[in-house]
Amino acid sequence: VSDRDGIKADTVGGTGKAILAQAFPSWSTASFDETYFLTCLLHDIGTTDKNIHATLMSFEFYGGLIVLDVLKSLGAPIEQAENVAEAVIRHQDLGDVGTITRIGALIQLATIFDNMGENADLVAKETIEDVVKAYPRKKWSACFAATIRRENGLKPWAHTTHLGEEDFPEGVKGNKLMAPWDDTQ
C-alpha cells in the first residue's frame, strides 16, 4: 500500500471508528473491527498506478478481486476475505435502494464523509482534528479528485461515473468539511 493509500486508510479508519462508536456501537466486535481495518487498508488498492493500468475494470471491482486473492493466500477465513472484497467492490456503490453488509455500510459512510464531507453530523470536529493530527491529509482531496479523473479518462465506463462524471471529482476536490485540514503535512 502506497503512502497516499495509507493516509486514506488511516483517515477512513479513524473517522469510521468514530461513526461506529457513535451510531452503531453494537456492531463492534473483535472480528468486525479487524475486518473493517482490513477493508480500510485495502479499499483503494485498485487506484495504485500499477493496478489502475492493469485492467479495463473499474478500480473498485479490480481491487475487490485483488483483495480476495491476497486475503485468501494469506490464510484469512473465507468469510472475512469475501466480506472485505464485497465492501471494496461496493464502497462507492452509493444509493438509497437495496441492502449492504455492515462492513460495506460503514466503509461507505466513512469514505463519503472523508471524500465529500457528507454526513458531517456523524463525527465531531474534535475527532476530525485528532484524526488529521495523527494522519495528515497531505492534500488528499486534490489527489483523489485527480485519481478519479485519471480513471475516468482511461475508462470512460468506470463505475465512479455513476456518481457524476464531473460532480464527483469536483465534490471531492471542493470538500468544504475537510478543507481546513487538507494541507496538513
Q: Positions of the model-derived regions?
A:
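Membrane-interface starts of transmembrane alpha-helices
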Residues: 77, 81-82
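Short leucine-rich amphipathic alpha-helices used at interfaces
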Residues: 51, 58-59, 102, 108
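His-Asp-centered metal-binding catalytic motifs of divalent-metal-dependent phosphohydrolases/nucleases
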Residues: 31-53, 59, 63, 67, ...
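An active-site-proximal "capping" alpha-helix that borders the catalytic cofactor pocket
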Residues: 12-13, 58-74
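Divalent metal-dependent phosphate-bond-processing catalytic cores, especially two-metal-ion Mg2+/Mn2+ enzymes
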Residues: 3, 10, 14-30, 76, ...
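Active-site flanking loop/helix segments enriched in acidic
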Residues: 1-9, 46-51
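Short acidic, glycine/proline-enriched loop segments that cap or flank alpha-helices
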Residues: 54, 75-76
